């Protein structure tokens, strides 16, 4: 019996399309566990992507984004925080999912971001816990929406038009167990008994059987013995 871990999969639904991400259950168990718990509680339903920086990150997960006050977006979170979880196997590649936090390394709760391009300057300081496997075109579309910029300095990274996170659903990971199969019997060229190309071994056995039958007939059956002697005398 062999076992192989199948990672959890997150399905992130937005008004600009769907994003599918694989989660790093084994390398970031605390962070992934927190994310899955929130998703299963429908915590992420009907939020907004409140921070958008093209060629950097798109960010969501703040329950304050549900109200009509954009100035408090980015200040909220869930009731519990988790410690910073860093793995050398997880870096800020294009499409990486990471946990947003304050200046306190252990302050991450519910807000998360998706990288728009590689952002290795964040490595070691922010927890990566998954990677987009489908829907990077949606990530790019969100990253390219219009933001307020210099028109509203306090909302410079906030989109002018709302971009919605409808919900997050997770198919949780599991151990896949399969039966181990032993080595199969080798197929020998030339038939069951082998003998190389052309089946020479099988032919020799057939000749031996015919000779044996002939000998038995020779000694056991008088008429056959006489016939054989007659043939031999003619030769």
What are these model-derived regions, one by one?
Residues 1-235:
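Cyclophilin-like peptidyl-prolyl cis-trans isomerases
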């Amino acid at each position: 019996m062999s076992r192989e871990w199948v990672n959890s999969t997150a399905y992130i639904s937005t008004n600009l399309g769907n994003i599918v991400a694989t989660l790093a259950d084994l390398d970031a168990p605390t962070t992934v566990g927190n994310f899955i718990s929130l998703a299963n509680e429908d915590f992420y339903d009907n939020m907004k992507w409140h921070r958008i920086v093209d060629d950097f990150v798109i960010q969501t997960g703040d329950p304050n984004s549900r109200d009509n006050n954009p100035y408090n977006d980015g200040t909220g979170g869930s009731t519990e925080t988790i410690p910073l979880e860093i793995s050398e196997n997880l870096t800020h590649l294009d499409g990486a999912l990471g946990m947003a936090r304050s200046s306190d390394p252990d302050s991450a709760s519910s807000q998360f971001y998706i990288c728009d391009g590689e952002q290795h300057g964040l490595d070691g300081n922010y927890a990566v816990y998954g990677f987009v496997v489908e829907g990077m075109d949606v990530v790019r579309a969100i990253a390219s929406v219009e933001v307020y910029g210099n028109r509203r300095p306090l909302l410079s990274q906030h989109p002018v038009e709302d971009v919605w996170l409808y919900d997050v659903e997770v198919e949780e990971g599991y151990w896949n167990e399969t039966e181990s199969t032993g080595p199969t019997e080798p197929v020998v060229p030339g038939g069951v008994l082998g003998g190389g190309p052309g089946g020479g071994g099988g032919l020799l056995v057939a000749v031996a059987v015919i000779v044996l039958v002939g000998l038995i007939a020779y000694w056991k059956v008088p008429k056959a013995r006489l016939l054989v002697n007659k043939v031999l005398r003619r030769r």
